[in-house]
């Protein structure tokens, strides 16, 4: 649809200053790092998806199936994110939508209707709505399982499962009421979600790194360790500066982020080696 409609897309070698948006100025003035990596919450890395392993992993017969189930699906989601990024770039370059972060939801509707027409636009919008609903459903199920197993809460009967679910649903309802009643509620909630989504990924990287130490794969531990350290820097720097966080000036926020990343690497390596040594003694 973007090619048929003739959406103007910019390449790396093009002039990044269009009539409607100066991309170069945005990258320098808006602190592209870490804001970009928080904004593209699921397209690059999604810690939120790791919460679904509690359910999905129980449906697999072997760990080899994890590559198709998790790794390949994240590559596919990255491809979807690239499509949306290109579509948004085309919409802004055409001047169909004002470049304003508060109008992001309206941009989605404009893209769907302009590229796919009224019927196709509705179908695409339904897809945009269904994806977070199904992800939320799976995440809440995983949360219930994790809480019940960690606190040793019996879940053998439907009544007991419903009781624990009701508590979780009540907490979610409070958050949704706030997002709906407050004028800036959704934007605030979305910022917290984006940050917490990337923060969750740190625990996934930590678990992978420790597992590799335990299973004599320490020479490959840099594969999860490097992105884990990077996103430690990103998430800590962002929350240190953000208004929803500690609102610290950028320079000390960057320093805090670097220190946190170094500490992350040190803790993971120390704990991983400790776990590996303990297993060797057994």
Label every model-predicted segment:
Residues 2-18, 64, 71-110, 180-184:
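Extracellular/periplasmic helix-exit of transmembrane alpha-helices
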Residues 54-78, 105-111, 136-164:
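Helix-loop-helix connectors at the membrane interface of multi-pass transporters/channels
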Residues 139-157, 184-189, 205-223:
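Alpha-helical transmembrane segments
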Residues 22-34, 113-123, 154-162, 197:
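Membrane-interfacial loop-to-helix junctions in multi-pass transporters
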Residues 163-176, 197-206, 222-240, 257-264:
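Hydrophobic membrane-spanning alpha-helices of multi-pass integral membrane proteins
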Residues 205-229, 242-282:
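Terminal cytosolic tails of multi-pass membrane transporters
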Residues 72-81, 88-99, 121, 125, ...:
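Loop-to-transmembrane helix boundary motifs in multi-pass membrane proteins
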Residues 1-22, 209-219, 234-244:
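Hydrophobic alpha-helical segments and their helix-loop junctions in multi-pass secondary transporters
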């Amino acid at each position: 649809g973007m090619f048929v409609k003739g959406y103007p897309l910019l390449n790396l070698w093009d002039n990044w200053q269009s009539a409607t948006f100066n991309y170069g100025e945005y990258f320098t003035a808006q602190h592209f790092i870490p804001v970009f990596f928080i904004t593209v919450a699921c397209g690059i890395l999604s810690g939120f998806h790791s919460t679904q392993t509690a359910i999905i992993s129980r449906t697999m017969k072997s760990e080899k199936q994890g590559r198709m189930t998790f790794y390949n699906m994240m590559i596919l989601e990255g491809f979807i994110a690239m499509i949306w990024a290109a579509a948004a770039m085309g919409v802004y370059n055409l001047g169909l939508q004002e470049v304003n972060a508060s109008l992001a939801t309206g941009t989605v509707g404009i893209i769907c209707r302009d590229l796919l027409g009224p019927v196709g636009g509705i179908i695409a919008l339904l897809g945009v709505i269904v994806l977070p609903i199904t992800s939320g459903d799976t995440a809440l199920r995983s949360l219930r399982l994790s809480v019940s197993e960690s606190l040793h809460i019996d879940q053998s009967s439907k009544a007991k499962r419903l009781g624990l679910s009701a508590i979780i649903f009540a907490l979610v309802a409070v958050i949704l009421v706030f997002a709906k009643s407050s004028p800036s509620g959704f934007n605030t909630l979305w910022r917290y979600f984006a940050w917490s989504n990337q923060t969750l990924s740190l625990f996934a990287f930590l678990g992978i790194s420790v597992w590799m130490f335990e299973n004599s794969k320490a020479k490959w531990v840099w594969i999860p360790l490097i992105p884990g350290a990077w996103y430690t820097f990103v998430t800590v720097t962002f929350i240190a500066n953000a208004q929803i966080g500690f609102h610290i000036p950028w320079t000390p926020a960057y320093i805090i982020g670097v220190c946190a990343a170094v500490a992350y690497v040190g803790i993971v390596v120390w704990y991983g080696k400790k776990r590996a040594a303990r297993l060797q003694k057994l």
